Amino acid sequence: VLLLMSVGTSVTQDPMVLLSVPSVILIGSDVNVLVDHAASTEDVSVVVRAEEFLTKKQLATQTITLTQLDPAIATLKLGFDIENPDKTNSASTKHHVRLVAKVESKSFNKEITAHALLSYRSGHVVVQTDKPIYTPDEKVKYRMFPMNREDVHRIPVRQSMTVDIVNADGVIVERQIKTIKATDEGIVDGTSFTIPAISKHGTWKIFARMSGAPNINSSAEFDVREYILPTFEVKINPKQRVFHINDEEFVVDITANYFNQELVSGTAYVRYFLENGDVPKLVDSSSTTLVAGEGLSILKKEKLLKLFPNAKDLLAFSLTIKTTVLSSQAAETEEAELVGIKIVESRYQITATKTSRYFKPELPYFIQVEVRNADGSPSKEVDVVAKVQVGSATINPQKMRTDSNGLTSFTVTPPNVNQLTVTVRTDERHPSNEQGELVYTAQKYASASYMHIDVTRIMRLGETLNVFLTAKTTQLNAVTHFTYMVLTRGVIVKTNRKTKESGGGPSNVRIPITPDMAPRFRFLAYYILPGGEIVADSVTVEVTELCKSQVSLSLKGRPTLEPKAMLTLDLIGEPDARVGLLAVDQAVYAVNRKHRLTQDRVWKAMETFDTGCTAEGGAGRPGVFSDAGLALITSKGLNTTDRSEIGCPKVPSRKPRQLSMLQIRREAEKYTQEFRKCCVDGLKMSPTGQGCEERLKRVTGPKECVDAFLQCCKKAEEYRKSESLGAKTVLRRNDFMELDLMNEDEVNMMAYFPQSWGWNKYKNSCKYGRHPQIRLQLPDTITTWNMQAVSISKTRGVCLADPLLLVSTKDFFIKLHLPYSVKRGEQTEIRVILYNYMEESLTILTEMDIVESICSTSKSGAKPSQKSTVKGKGAMVVSFPIVPLKIGEHHISIRSRVYGRTFGDGVQKILRVAPEGVRDIRSESRSVHVEERETFFIKNEISPDVVPNSDVLTFISVKGDELAETMVNCLDAKSISNLIQIPTGCGEQNMIKMAPTTLTLIYLDSVQEWEKIGLHRREEAIGFLKQGYSRELSYRKADHSYAAFIKRPSSTWLTAFVVKVYSLAKRVIIVDNQELCGPVEWIIKNRQNSDGSYREDGPVIHREMQGGVGGTEGHVSMTAFILIGIQQAQEYCGVSVPNYKQSMNRAVQFLASKVSDLKRMYTIAITRYALALQDPESEAAHSSWKKLENRTTFESKGHRYWKAEETSHVLRMSAISVEATAYGLLTYLRKKDYESAREIVDWLTEQRNYGGGFQSTQDTILALQAMAQYKMDSSSKELIDVQLEITSPKNNFEKKMKITEETRFVQEPHKIPPGGNITIKASGRGTFTLSIMSVFNKVAPSSKSCSTFDLKVTMTEADDGESPQGRLGWFDGKRRRRRDIGDEGGVEAVYRMNMCTRYKPRKEDLSSESGMTIIEVNMLTGFIPDKNDLIQLKESVDKYISNYEITDSVLIIYWDKVPSTEDYCFAFKIKQMLRSDMIQPVTASVYDYYSPADKCTRLYNLPGGYVELSPLCQNDLCQCVEVSCPAKKPKFDTSITVLHRQEAACVAGIDYAYVGIVDNRTEVGSFVYYTVNIQTVIKSGQDQAIQPKATRLFIVTRSCDGRLGMETPRQYLLMGRKGETKDRNDRFQYVLDASSWVEQWPVDEKCNQPNVQTFCAIKREYEFSMQIQGCSS
């Protein structure tokens, strides 16, 4: 950084001092202070120093002496230890440094000061991952390329970098400290990490920051989700980027190519939709044939005009194209979608962002414009005309043509006028109204003296830039020289003087273009006139080809190779450059093209260092400097304004025009705009299949809306009936449709083959940049590999080579297609595709290896096999049906051998088998204080609900702060969903999310902990809060009250909650006083009763948001809650709102009058806090305090809390208890009793779930507020330094970790085996929080806890009659059937899900209707819900649901309320996307939003149930499945001897042998539970507690139960393996499988019967023998 100071003298005037310094300087950088001394004959001493802005602490100083005309440089180094003066806002970069130059000579003394904004961005780190997308449990590799800002080509060494791995919820899951070593030579390898098996899908980030710059992060992003690699890539390529409303057709090219460059032939099914944020409207669907990978589809304009006769109404929409391509070679299906195709009137957009808005009369004025298509892409080779007008006169009109980037430029020389009007317009072969046009006004430069810089604006590296400087002034003879500077990335890299040419002609400066000027630099020059006037100008020059030919890859030999082939690469680059290599499967980029490292991304990172704000000079002398990123200070008062922001001010954008929509049907035209939607919704067919009269019951609103809906609905019904009498055409299902549709989320990744490889580093150590040849071996994948080289050198910085594409293929090969996962016991198909690219046909034998625990069609132990003939240049599919019997990963191996040939192919991939049931999560938290040493235990027992023989994943995480886990989940919308683990999806969710974010910002600002979480998170949270505030204002009514939606009645409680949050938010963002005080005034005027209480006339939708407010003593708790909100706003509104204090006093009097009668714990707690806020010494406050203290509950661990009543109407106990305890904690903090408060905090900490939240929203928000207040109020900050040793002796698990101040906010989850106790040994000092979470599949009950709701779920096949008919078809939406490949492209089947529920109120309920109600539907394997149906159910005026969400195969549906007097029913379709049989039943649950534990759960399945073996099951497959079942021995079979039974009981692995009577049989989900009363214990095994008459559970799968045939109350001999789990009574339970022995065993009373006497003799001998000998013999 250079500080330029000029001292000028004249004979008649005092000398002038000029300081020009970059307005943003870098912490830790060298500040080169250039002192330019002119026209002096004496020595000048200059003392230059840098100071902290507020404290004036001297940071650095140097003294230099100038002699005559020689300039000098003083170098100051700013360290990294500059104190941050704004402790409460440590994430902000608004801190200044004062630079002072004191000039002394015999005749002159002057001190002048400049201020520069301090930037912490000392460098940038380019981060590269080995691919852009991963699945859970996959390893991520990354590397970093660190660069300096001052010199991006100087590789920093011996600095440390902090690397944070941040998950999709914004939580730091891992922190790594990396030291840049000299041996790294520019490429720092990160420590690879594995994504946890249980991870939320979304975008993860790797943040890397240099030491000394804690708030500047460089990042790389990657996506995490389950995905597949497609078989081939489909591309949609419109001939035009936009659809113009005057075009008659829209032509689209459809291309499809395999990733080995082979072309796909087949059929493309193309659908066109109009979208504007509402339900997509199908415009047209058609099919086209693909020949050699290419096909053509055309959308006629007339199709659009059928929906909107007025073409301009289409401008409100965008066009979406979806296509499904079915290959004729192998009947494989892939899809593509192109969204956001604009429908426009103008084809082009013209901007001039790089052109100055100020001109200098009689000097050249340079104008550069950028022309883009309406979709934002560059308009290449487009004719442009330009004219400049002065009044009515036009100056030199010009015609140009854009280059490949859409750029063109021209120069004019304007006369001496004050204003120019510049008009630039495209001149293509389109009508005039379709051209693009830009009109702007340029103003005259403010000074009467000018300077002009004439340069070539784009230069290549290595060229020499000729700069011509021209001065225009009436004092031209006084100008002797120019001073110029070259700035790049905010740094002055070059400065000098140039003597002015005699005669006033242009003075030439030659500037060699060097790498440090790339990718863009500024040239600024000025001269000084007598009297001190400074005349300046600046220009921006682009530098290209910095990386051209600096790094490249080439392949020796042919570019097409076979898998496993060795290849030789030539790597050409800069000498001594370090190069990182990477090869990625092109199919990966087809799945996700985002997050790739590109050269453009590197350039943009470098450009962010530029502190200038415009491309050219500003309005006047100071503007030229400030716009170039410089501060200018002179002793004559000509100064720039101190810079306040690192970035540039944003230019306000023009608001988009609002486009009206034409009514879409003539029926709708009969109604006014207000009620038109009512008619349109009536025209649509209901997904529920209900008639108009039934639908009418759900229509709310004015009578006109109801009438419009009914009339239009009846007309549509009549029309459908008339059309249904006509002929129907149905596309029949073709044979190829029996194959699975490839779906991105269901198909397994190619785990056997790498998706990326070649992750190595090389050094160009040879001369001329040629590296020794690199030899690599290709993986086995048939694909094209995208090989990339990234180079970092001292001369060029970071450069990327053009990708080298390596095709890996064979003439004959096979591909194995597997779903991502299947459930145990479900029948599915293994699909193998045989590709033959030879000319002749091949006869092939394809075999599948036998896999233990997977049933297939093998016979007598032989491999399943199929013989097939594949034509030349063709493909064929062979399938192997299987039924997996064991959970886990199984290797599926396929081999194909060609008859008569010596070649073949083989593939092995992993099939993931998941357990039955539904996923469940159990969590526990504990707060631990350590003084020196502490040992404690946590139970880690396996739940009795776990699916038999399935895995339990248990994770344990530790954080060194009670609030850490909660805080990091409060900073953005996605993370809050992790904090509050209940559904969100209605209007009030905005406040649910704003409140915790606000509290977190206040807390972290107060305790100055942003650095440990990540300083970038503060700006993100501020932005999120601002968006929330802006969004919440849309719910405000004209009278300043609030409701969930504008049309709903105003809610007192919600308005008060808004007041509370706004009062807090004002501490961190700008909240208009009227927006805060208006709601307070509304409450006081409209919602306060005569007795001082506040009332609620319009309840919120989220009644759960209210927490304990409401129910018994609701009028008291409501008044207390509202009073608290008004109290918090008092400092802002106490004066402006009339009757403010009077209202509060009346509310206090009301509460005081009720204290003695209060019974509910929650009401006591909130009332006490409200009274304490108003007057803690009042009699009512003391009285309520006594009540609160008397109701305190103490735990043995020293914790204290307040237990709410279990019969509470509003919430289940734990949530209300948390909320009451939070108010209790706030009360103790008001009394400054921190010792007791600590005990309360400990209890609250242990109530949290794994994500840091509690049971609901209000208790989470209140607990966060109270705990944060405790942390802020505590007198001293508790430091932490704790060593932990976590062990589980039963599982041989041991993990050691350390928690320090640096890592206290880092959450590192560790996987721990389930079962047994966990021992935690802690040593050191500090407090930490330990959280444990278990994730498992639990047995889905057929019904559960249906005391609050009833629920019915039925499934029916979708009826052909639901297909859209004629003109009403687009209203009804596409009714997709199994056969409709043209509509859906691979949907296997369509079913209708019918759901009915009813509320069952309790005696103490005050309402006969539920509050906000949720239905959670777990989707059947391979099925997805029909979104169009769901949207219609939500958006139509006969509204059936309030909202819906789809996450991770779970559909969540919201209702405002459910009645108790009748069933509330609706229906929607579900579509089968993956072929599967023997589908396991899954659950649907209904519950009240604010009481998620009280669920009513029902099982559902397809019609027919598929509980037994599928009728499609082949004989061999069925027999295999049956073999896995326990086989009941023949009844009273005397051929089975005593010895046979003894051997069976004593064989290895058999743990028990019991005789017991079956008391009960219960079906639970996919399993049957038998309750057995044990009569005789023959062999007890591990179950040492078992005795006769004891009860044990025996479990068998429902698919096996029919063969087993156990009956009540018969007696059986049962032998089998040990029980892995225990029931709720801590008793072992046993799974019956193929190793089990089940035999009917007669009771003694039956042994007198002749037909069983022989068998009974064997029975007695066996029992006696086992009792005497056991298994010892």
Swiss-Prot record:
Residues 1-13 form the signal peptide. One of its GO terms (cellular component) is extracellular space. Disulfide bonds join 678-705, 679-712, 692-713, 1525-1600, 1546-1671. The keyword Glycoprotein applies. GO terms for biological process: complement activation, classical pathway; inflammatory response; innate immune response. Transmembrane segments: none annotated. SMART domains: A2M, A2M_N_2, A2M_recep, ANATO, C345C, Thiol-ester_cl. Precursor of non-enzymatic components of the classical, alternative, lectin and GZMK complement pathways, which consist in a cascade of proteins that leads to phagocytosis and breakdown of pathogens and signaling that strengthens the adaptive immune system. This is Complement C3. It comes from Lethenteron camtschaticum.
